[in-house]
């Protein structure tokens, strides 16, 4: 269900703005998107797992907050990130 450390470091390298950048909104949103995708696949087989569904809703809310922040601060980076991740919003 969760993402591996190797996948997380790959996402950090792909979306980082600098060398060891792990805290930028782009990196955080990319990691959250990966976790959301994993949980969505989990619900295809475990439809009654309401405890994990609540966690999914929290992740989606957190990602939405970060996306709103990025849009408020730098709309060009926001649009580029949405394009790269394939999030339609």
Curated annotation (Swiss-Prot):
Q: List the disulfide bonds.
A: none
GO cellular component entries:
cytosolic small ribosomal subunit
For this protein, the record's InterPro entries field holds:
Ribosomal_uS15 (IPR000589), Ribosomal_uS15_bac-type (IPR005290), uS15_NS1_RNA-bd_sf (IPR009068)
Superkingdom of source: Bacteria
Q: Kindly list the GO molecular function terms attached to this UniProt entry.
A: rRNA binding; structural constituent of ribosome
Q: Which UniProt keywords apply?
A: Ribonucleoprotein, Ribosomal protein, RNA-binding, rRNA-binding
One GO-annotated biological process of the protein = translation
Keyword Ribonucleoprotein set for record: yes
Give the family from UniProt. Answer: Belongs to the universal ribosomal protein uS15 family.
Q: Which HAMAP family match?
A: Ribosomal_uS15_B
Task: Briefly state the protein's biological role.
Answer: One of the primary rRNA binding proteins, it binds directly to 16S rRNA where it helps nucleate assembly of the platform of the 30S subunit by binding and bridging several RNA helices of the 16S rRNA. Forms an intersubunit bridge (bridge B4) with the 23S rRNA of the 50S subunit in the ribosome.
Assembly and binders: Part of the 30S ribosomal subunit. Forms a bridge to the 50S subunit in the 70S ribosome, contacting the 23S rRNA.
Name the NCBIfam families for this protein.
S15_bact
User: What is the designated name of this protein?
Assistant: Small ribosomal subunit protein uS15
Q: Which organism is it from?
A: Methylobacterium nodulans (strain LMG 21967 / CNCM I-2342 / ORS 2060)
Tell me the name of the encoding gene: rpsO
């Amino acid at each position: 269900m969760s993402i591996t450390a190797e996948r997380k470091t790959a996402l950090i390298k792909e979306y980082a703005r600098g060398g060891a950048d792990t805290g930028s909104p782009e990196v955080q949103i990319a990691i959250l998107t990966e976790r959301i995708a994993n949980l969505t696949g989990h619900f295809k087989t475990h439809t009654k797992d309401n405890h994990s569904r609540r966690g999914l809703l929290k992740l989606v809310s957190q990602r939405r907050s970060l996306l709103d922040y990025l849009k408020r601060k730098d709309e060009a980076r926001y649009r580029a990130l949405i394009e790269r991740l394939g999030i339609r919003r």
